Design a protein with these regions (language model features):
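Amphipathic alpha-helical segments enriched in hydrophobic/aromatic and basic residues
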Residues: 32, 41-42, 63-74, 92-95, ...
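N-terminal intrinsically disordered/low-complexity leader segments
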Residues: 1-16, 160, 201, 207-225
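Amphipathic alpha-helical packing segments from all-alpha helical-bundle domains
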Residues: 129-154, 165-166
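Hydrophobic alpha-helical connector segments
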Residues: 69, 76-121
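Hydrophobic/aromatic-rich alpha-helical bundle segments in the mid-to-C-terminal region
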Residues: 156-200, 214
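HTH DNA-binding helix-turn interface
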Residues: 11, 35-37, 50, 57-67, ...
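Short hydrophobic clusters on alpha-helical segments that form packing/core surfaces
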Residues: 24-32, 78, 95, 135
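Basic, helix-initiating cap at the start of DNA-binding domains
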Residues: 1-35, 39-51, 194
Length: 225
């Protein structure tokens, strides 16, 4: 026999679940910052919230998935920023302005983003292959959503037009390239958003360089609003 649940009761249950989920995320990042990602166990995260490991796994499949909650919020905000860019902007310029503005918001703590948590994620991506791998996997899974928004901006059907797919792929590549450049010390800046801005600038300028041609790196820009 099916059972029903009164709206107020269901509402309380959902709020309790949300509070537990947020408490697990807060505890996880606190431990990640104190001990490091690899040294932190699921059991320790659960103990911080006074729940069992089994309860943790009701909300997250792994420690890596906790990290992805922040990236999911960041990605959603970037899609919204991309959709709101002026229609007159070329696709790569719109992608650049949307991505860089959201990254700077994460770094500066605006729009509700936690800059310390963002910095913690950057450190974990550098030190943990598991976190870096899951981040790349997350980006690949979200590429279809970027493609859809780009196609809507262009007024084309992505089923028959490959340009939205190429632009979305370049966007993902820009994030990966920026991280690799920053990690290797190629760039003199310590801000991820500035390196990402430069990478998008290179993409906008084109990559058909002659072997002996020396061209300056694009300057960092401030996205227009």
């Amino acid at each position: 026999m099916e059972t029903s649940c009164a709206a107020p009761t269901c509402g309380r249950r959902e709020r309790k679940k949300q509070r537990t989920r947020e408490a697990l995320i807060d505890a996880a990042f606190r431990l990640f910052q104190e001990k490091g990602f690899e040294a932190t166990t699921v059991e320790e995260i659960a103990d911080e919230v006074d729940v069992s490991s089994r309860t943790f796994f009701r909300y997250f499949a792994s420690k890596e998935d906790v990290v992805l909650t922040f990236q999911e919020e960041q990605f959603t905000t970037m899609l919204e920023a991309l959709a709101s860019r002026p229609a007159s902007e070329p696709v790569m310029t719109a992608l650049r302005n949307a991505a860089v503005s959201v990254l700077r918001a994460c770094e500066d703590g605006t729009y509700g983003f936690d800059p310390e948590r963002f910095g913690c994620i950057q450190q974990m991506m550098e030190s943990s292959p598991a976190v870096f791998g899951r981040s790349l996997e997350h980006g690949q899974k979200k590429q279809a959503e970027i493609t859809r928004v780009i196609a809507e901006r262009m007024g084309v059907d992505p089923a028959v037009d490959l340009r939205p797919h190429v632009a979305a792929g370049l966007s993902n590549s820009a994030f990966r390239s920026a991280f690799e450049v920053l990690s290797s010390g190629v760039s003199g800046t310590g801000r991820f958003s500035d390196v990402l801005d430069q990478v998008f600038g290179v993409m906008e300028d084109g990559l058909n360089y002659l072997p002996a041609e020396q061209t300056p790196m694009p300057e960092t820009t401030t996205p227009s609003r």
